[in-house]
């Protein structure tokens, strides 16, 4: 995915406000052997790009002054109540060094699971992304979580995710192995089942 930015010469609160009034968003590019670079981007184009999941989880081709560099989006600052992006941070990528980032989780097949089909359970997504480490060339846009075998009362953990070759959970995620999805029977459904059971007449 390509992102076009421009070199930013002016700094400070006043300069940032003037840029916002002109439909621009401030940013910075850092990392690697090059010095940090102050940039500005078209706000509307950036706003629409930020709505795409891939913009947050993929390596981007950032073009500044006609030169392209490969980066990851690392931080976004939004206005507290207006639909306004105040600032973005991009990190340069070294193709030979592993990066730590968050990958989105795509949950599949819950509707065909025993939890839903046999028990009318509700499958909840506890987290929507997980921290991973890999070389830039191995970075997945997302990770799939197959829920087809989950049963009522069960949970899936981070280590249950089928990771692509070259991709691993970060050390602390691997150690904690957090819950990523769970299947629970709603309280109302349990009460209804109990009431139905009590209403049954024992066989003579």
Curated annotation (Swiss-Prot):
One of its GO terms (molecular function) is structural constituent of ribosome. Keywords: Ribonucleoprotein, Ribosomal protein, RNA-binding, rRNA-binding. The keyword RNA-binding applies. GO terms for biological process: translation. It comes from the Bacteria. GO terms for cellular component: cytosolic large ribosomal subunit. Pfam families: Ribosomal_L25p (PF01386), Ribosomal_TL5_C (PF14693). This is one of the proteins that binds to the 5S RNA in the ribosome where it forms part of the central protuberance. Part of the 50S ribosomal subunit; part of the 5S rRNA/L5/L18/L25 subcomplex. Contacts the 5S rRNA. Binds to the 5S rRNA independently of L5 and L18. Belongs to the bacterial ribosomal protein bL25 family. CTC subfamily. NCBIfam families: bL25_bact_ctc, PRK05618.1-2, PRK05618.1-5, PRK05943.1. This is Large ribosomal subunit protein bL25. It comes from Burkholderia mallei (strain ATCC 23344). The gene is rplY.
């Amino acid at each position: 995915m390509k992102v076009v930015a421009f070199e930013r010469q002016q700094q400070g609160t006043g300069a940032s406000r003037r840029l916002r009034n002109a439909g621009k968003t401030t940013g910075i590019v850092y990392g690697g052997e090059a010095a940090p670079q102050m940039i500005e981007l078209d706000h509307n184009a950036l706003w629409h790009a930020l709505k795409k999941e891939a913009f947050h989880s993929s390596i981007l081709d950032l073009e500044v002054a006609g030169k392209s560099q490969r980066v990851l989006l690392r931080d976004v600052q939004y206005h507290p109540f207006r639909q306004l992006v105040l600032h973005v941070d991009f990190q340069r990528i070294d193709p030979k060094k592993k990066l730590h980032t968050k990958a989105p989780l795509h949950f599949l097949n819950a509707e065909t699971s025993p939890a839903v089909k046999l028990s009318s359970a509700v499958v909840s997504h506890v987290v929507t992304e997980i921290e991973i480490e890999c070389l830039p060339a191995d970075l997945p846009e997302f990770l799939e979580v197959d829920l087809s075998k989950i049963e009522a009362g069960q949970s899936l953990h981070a280590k249950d995710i089928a990771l692509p070759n070259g991709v691993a959970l970060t050390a602390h995620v691997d150690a904690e192995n957090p819950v990523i999805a769970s299947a629970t029977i709603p309280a109302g459904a349990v009460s209804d089942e109990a009431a139905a059971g009590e209403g049954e007449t024992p066989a003579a």
